[in-house]
Amino acid sequence: MTIRFSDAHVDTWRKEGAVVVPEFFNDKEIKDVTKDFKKIFPGRKAEDKALNKKKKGDFGNKLPLQLSGEPMGKTTMDQFKNFENIPFDCSSSLNLIAVHPSLIEFARSVLKTNDVRLYQAQAWAKFTGEADFDQAFHCDFGNHTLTVPSQDECLNSITFIIYFTDVTEEHGPTHYVNRTDSNGFEGMKRFLKNREDVDHQKELRRFERSAAGPAGTLLAYGIDVFHRGTNLTEPGGYRYAMTSCFKKAGNDSIGYTSWPWHFTKPWQNIFEHATPDQLSCFGVPMPGDPFWTEETLSLTQLRYPKWNMSEYR
């Protein structure tokens, strides 16, 4: 397997909490995933004019579950209109991209473990005019843990946002602030003390960086990193992206998706094409695990008749 990230990328992530890796995915992967996006989000149409629901002085729409306890507004709901959990009724190209071997290796490297779990993975399609996608700066720990980020980054998690379309500043790239910059003005403490602090938002915007890039670009960041979505303003513009979040196995302080809860989804599209390594990211025991007995092998085969279980026998 060709490694698609470098030690420098890992070092930057450890220091700054975020790093952009261009051309992480190749043209064929981009083409195949894009085809699946069009299948699972059919008939979506972008407008010629961007939607702006902000009032003068606003710093983006509030996000749900960012520790505010306030109800989600209509605009915020619209931002997540095309935000869906895997698996989908499409090819393995999209269904397995969140557990691509290079993403798994990246997660293992930064979390310093060989045993990682995928705890969130969604396809996200945005279209100009469908919503006002501008967000205020926030951190993901608000809805990924009930406490706060650990001081040991290996006890936190890593989130990947992958673009499968070219993303310019007019296509709603994620903006983020390096950890060393936000720490310089006690960003986390100020956020927790007053989540509506306009001056804090202004300060964060002074240091914001853009993750804009061509299709195949990867943004990796931690749950303690301030970031925000930006609005799509390109006439007829759209953005196809995938989120993929990993944590160390056994880290129960972090969570988001309970995969068995989505049992009605077409899991055969994953089981019939994934490797044992990829399936383990969903919590499926590896070959040789004591879980696998003649009985469990037989029953699991009944559940997924077309799954090739030869490596587990």
Model-flagged regions — what are they?
Residues M1-K15, P22-T145:
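Non-heme Fe(II)-dependent double-stranded beta-helix
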Residues Q120-A125, C139-F141, I158, I162-D166, ...:
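Short, structured patches in soluble enzyme cores that scaffold and shape functional sites
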Residues H100, R108-R117, S150-C154, F164-H171, ...:
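Secondary-structure boundary elements
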Residues G43, L51, R190-F191, L218-A220, ...:
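Non-heme Fe(II)/2-oxoglutarate
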Residues E130-F137, L146-P149, E170-R179, F185-K189, ...:
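A short secondary-structure junction signal
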Residues C154-S157, V167-H227:
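Double-stranded beta-helix
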Residues K126-T128, V177-G184, R239, C245-N251:
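Short edge-strand/loop segments of extracellular domains
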Residues T113, L118-Q120, L155-I161, H171, ...:
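Extracellular structured ligand-interaction cores
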